[in-house]
Amino acid sequence: MSKLARLEREEIMECQVMWEPDSKKDTQMDRFRAAVGTACGLALGNYNDLYHWSVRSYMDFWAEFWKFSGIVYSRMYDEVVDTSKGIADVPEWFRGSRLNYAENLLRHKENDRVALYVAREGREEIVKVTFEELRQQVALFAAAMRKMGVKKGDRVVGYLPNSAHAVEAMLAAASIGAIWSSTSPDFGVNGVLDRFSQIQPKLIFSVEAVVYNGKEHGHLEKLQRVVKGLPDLQRVVLIPYVLPREKIDISKIPNSVFLDDFLASGTGAQAPQLEFEQLPFSHPLFIMFSSGTTGAPKCMVHSAGGTLIQHLKEHMLHGNMTSSDILLYYTTVGWMMWNWMVSALATGASLVLYDGSPLVPTPNVLWDLVDRIGITILGTGAKWLSVLEEKDMKPVETHNLHTLHTILSTGSPLKAQSYEYVYRCIKSSVLLGSISGGTDIISCFMGQNSSIPVYKGEIQARNLGMAVEAWDEEGKAVWGASGELVCTKPIPCQPTHFWNDENGSKYRKAYFSKFPGVWAHGDYCRINPKTGGIIMLGRSDGTLNPNGVRFGSSEIYNIVEAFDEVEDSLCVPQYNRDGEERVVLFLKMASGHTFQPDLVKRIRDAIRLGLSARHVPSLILETRGIPYTLNGKKVEVAVKQVMAGRTVEHRGAFSNPETLDLYRDIPELQDF
């Protein structure tokens, strides 16, 4: 057995339980398992039994969940799915059914219950929107859209902050059968046009300014340039957000109108009534975009039915979410977690929409909201938890948090030390759910599960209906060893197609070129055969393979970033003309610390001890900055391109594109 394999095996044997479910609590997962057992005549003793049945008999699983979820529809399906087709065939799901996504999100009739809590940086007031008020607003938006000629299949877009109006505009578009897409105000002009110019929207919603990190950021100049680059736009709706209407000049923006005038255009003598177009399950709902860090963003079309049923599965079964829950996911409208979060309305839960920095005026801003509103589920990026730990924040000592039962984390792998931090310094009884999937499926392959334990450093389990495995280079499943994350059977949440990809070649290249007929997601992971948990090891396009040893960059990060002297790090491969590979580790030093040979030696020793000698980088260098996407993900592939002397054309997806130039013409890299 190799040293690497032995280390992985030892790690598996050292599983540490951080949280266990209450055996007396009856969850929706338990009720669903019992319902399936009765309906199908099965003895399903635990989650593992249910999971394996759900992927083995995936057609029956989705049919049973359709019933359990209470999806609102006007016509029942004729067929769940054609099981003779594989995932690469992109089979049609629930053929013959008719439904509407927005109708399902607005189905709960407790009119006076709060649907949306709206909180903003720098404002004390929390605005409440009830379900009845939300329905009324969606009706107004939809009537105005219809008045201007928006119809099924038209694209409606938002260049918006995380706000009630973003939710209302999206639901209105969905009620008509228009396709919604959105980016957040932190995207630059090029980043927005790289996305929206591909889908030719008819209508755009935006704002005049936003507040972030204690500063007001004007938005009109960017919006004007975006509008100029979208010739098919018929209407630009400006929502006064920071300033009152009378202080905003939109005269330079063609076809522009203020929100109140736009909404008034759709009203007659009586308030408009909500109408929900009844559409096929596969009707397009969202166009989502890939990061665009190495080329033009891919435009992924997600269906209304597939998105709805997948999100309901994750919220109801895996999250045990009910109408008594209040969910805050810290996200922008440019990240798929916003779409995922909004779908929670279909459970009757309330949403908290927070717009602003999670660290201003203090790093406690989200914890303050938890106590003030009574939030039960808090979602964030793994990076935020690391930042809190670095700042030695201890909410367990400063906040009540008595309503909080779940913390969710995604965006990047959650470090093992973050598990310890959460249970020691935040709340010992909380379910810490690391979840992982992607924009490509607008959901999760794996994630939180209220019916099984949480183990340190592991995502709890593969999600129901998701036939996920880790494969080696030969296309064989590996257990307890590192491999490519694949999905072997059809899922309703895969994109129906890519926009502007008539022959499907881009789609096939994106997911099915590595293993024909099997979805390769682009992530590197390890599945623990003892617990069923998963450890994410980073993007497989950033996989390191020096001297034939394959490993993920996050394995290095987990060791390096435990050093107080290191604020951040980036681990990338470099190739010479002969195709040989060496690993280069860049360190961004923490404030007050300098890059020293002694630190380099201690890091090398720690990697050698924690992993193996073959994991030790060939070079460890200092850097002043590390590039991130606007969604907070490290950008390894683009740095690899710059190191190789290539140009990265599409910089609009980066939060700090200037840092890419730090990796060009580095003297220490020239002799390889």
Swiss-Prot record:
Keywords: ATP-binding, Cytoplasm, Fatty acid metabolism, Ligase, Lipid metabolism, Nucleotide-binding. Its main location: cytoplasm. Its EC number is 6.2.1.16. It is found in: Cytoplasm, Cytosol. GO terms for biological process: fatty acid metabolic process. CDD domains: AACS (cd05943). One of its GO terms (molecular function) is acetoacetate-CoA ligase activity. It catalyses: acetoacetate + ATP + CoA = acetoacetyl-CoA + AMP + diphosphate. One of its GO terms (cellular component) is cytosol. SUPFAM superfamilies: Acetyl-CoA synthetase-like. It holds the Pfam family ACAS_N. InterPro entries: Acac_CoA_synth, ACAS_N, AMP-bd_C_sf, AMP-binding_CS, AMP-dep_synth/lig_dom, ANL_N_sf. PANTHER family: ACETOACETYL-COA SYNTHETASE. Belongs to the ATP-dependent AMP-binding enzyme family. Converts acetoacetate to acetoacetyl-CoA in the cytosol. Ketone body-utilizing enzyme, responsible for the synthesis of cholesterol and fatty acids. This is Acetoacetyl-CoA synthetase.
